[in-house]
């Protein structure tokens, strides 16, 4: 009897210190969590949009498109050209040629303004091009009256390149949205892995505490030895589970680190003591979804890209229609011996309607098979694009509604899961009370507790799934949710 009282005293002291130790350990854990840096979704947003290589690469798309516009503007750059040739043989000057011209392409009517100076002298110079020693100055225009009057290749190229700036901007937004969506999914996977680890770790702590308590009662003879064995098995099972989720947490942290870069373009790694922000499932109103659908119809990157292609094909179609016209180019120049404005030149050698040079060029393919075939090809591409635009708009709208339905399903499931967790906690508490009275078994307590942990893990999985579905809702609408 005396030994039994001593054993009871030792067990009471052991349980007292265990409870104190667990309380201290819990306080220390809370202190660590409090002191650890909370890596919020807003922090991730700052890293991604500021330093992510793909985001920086996407910005180059718009720069490249503007570079193409600049390149297309080069077709309208004024050009200066000159040529000189001279031949002397046997004390005779066969020819002395000097030709120079400033050509200024004009947007209007596809014309070219030409200012030139020619000096062709010598004993054997062609009479058609022979000039006086002072040479001839000419100012004139080259105008296409048929093909190229409404639109030509250089105007078509410039217009198309300007439209492609909008295409490139839409592609930039699309790539940035994709990067952010993947980052958000990885963040909530990390959140789930972290919460799962916390819950399983708490389960290990509870199982160890129960094992020590049951072992003490077994020594006193109040509990059969098999209960101690069962409690130890539960501890080991949960430790195995803890090691598994520990690896999952490490992997999730590494995957999230893929999105972290410094401002010096060096990769960063998420600190081990970093913890995710607290999360809950907030309700999404149907009004928000309707707004996203309307916004997607106007601004979704895929639709913007298709509309840009449609505009590009419309310009190409106009150009191909222009190619069906005959080519009629008229050139004309007013001529003068004047080399500068401060020199005297007789009126009959100065600029006037009696001193000119004019030319006409005409060509027209009889069957126009190449031109008609190209125009037909452009029309077919336009029809294909119209069908693609129609289908893409419908798919985007249905994708947004699908994400909304997923969110509503998560809301309902979470509400039920939270109630079930409350009920399970009541069951566990009641089972523990029955066990203390000797009316239950350790197996039932472990089962109730394991079920509770599984339900809590499932709740965190639902919360993470809800947050990923919310990010997917905005992504499928062609935008993203700011974390301000």
Where do the model's predicted regions map?
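Periplasmic alpha-helical coiled-coil/stalk elements that build and connect Gram-negative outer-membrane
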Residues: 170-292, 406, 410, 451-452, ...
């Amino acid at each position: 009897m005396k030994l039994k009282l001593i054993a009871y005293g030792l067990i009471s002291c052991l349980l007292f210190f265990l409870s104190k130790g667990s309380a201290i350990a819990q306080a220390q854990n809370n202190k660590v969590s409090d002191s650890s840096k909370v890596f919020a979704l807003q922090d991730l947003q700052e890293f991604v949009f500021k330093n992510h290589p793909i985001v920086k690469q996407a910005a180059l798309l718009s720069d490249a498109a503007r570079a193409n516009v600049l390149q297309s503007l080069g077709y309208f750059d004024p050009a200066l050209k000159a040529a000189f040739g001279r031949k002397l043989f046997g004390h005779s000057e066969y020819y002395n040629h000097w030709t120079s011209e400033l050509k200024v392409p004009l947007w209007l009517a596809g014309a070219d303004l030409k200012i030139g100076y020619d000096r062709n002298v010598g004993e054997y110079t062609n009479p058609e091009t022979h000039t006086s020693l002072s040479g001839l100055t000419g100012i004139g225009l080259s105008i296409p009256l048929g093909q190229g009057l409404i639109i030509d290749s250089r105007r078509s190229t410039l217009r198309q390149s300007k439209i492609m700036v909008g295409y490139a901007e839409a592609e930039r937004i699309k790539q940035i949205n994709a990067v952010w969506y993947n980052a958000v999914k990885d963040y909530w996977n990390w959140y789930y892995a972290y919460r799962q680890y916390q819950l399983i770790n708490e389960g290990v702590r509870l199982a160890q505490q129960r094992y020590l308590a049951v072992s003490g009662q077994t020594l006193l003879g109040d509990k059969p030895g098999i209960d101690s064995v069962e409690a130890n098995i539960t501890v080991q099972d949960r430790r195995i589970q803890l090691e598994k989720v520990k690896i999952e947490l490490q992997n999730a942290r590494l995957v999230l680190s893929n999105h972290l870069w410094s401002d010096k373009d060096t990769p960063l790694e998420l600190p081990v003591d970093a913890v995710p922000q607290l999360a809950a499932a907030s309700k999404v109103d149907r009004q928000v979804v309707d707004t996203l659908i309307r916004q997607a119809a106007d601004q979704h990157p895929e639709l913007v890209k298709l509309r840009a292609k449609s505009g590009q094909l419309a310009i190409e179609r106009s150009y191909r229609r222009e190619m069906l016209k005959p080519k009629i180019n008229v050139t004309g120049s007013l001529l003068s011996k004047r080399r500068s404005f401060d020199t005297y030149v007789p009126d009959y050698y100065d600029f006037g309607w009696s001193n000119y040079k004019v030319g006409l060029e005409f060509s027209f393919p009889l069957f126009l098979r190449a031109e008609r075939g190209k125009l037909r090809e452009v029309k077919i591409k336009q029809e294909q694009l119209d069908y693609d635009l129609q289908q893409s708009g419908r798919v985007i709208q249905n994708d947004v509604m699908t994400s909304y339905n997923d969110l509503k399903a998560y809301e309902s499931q979470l509400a039920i899961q939270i109630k079930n967790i409350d009920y399970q906690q009541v069951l566990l508490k009641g089972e523990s009370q029955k066990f203390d009275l000797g009316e239950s078994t350790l197996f039932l307590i472990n089962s109730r507790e394991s079920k509770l942990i599984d339900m809590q893990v499932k709740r965190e999985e639902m919360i993470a799934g809800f947050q990923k579905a919310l990010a997917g809702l905005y992504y499928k609408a062609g935008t993203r949710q700011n974390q301000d």
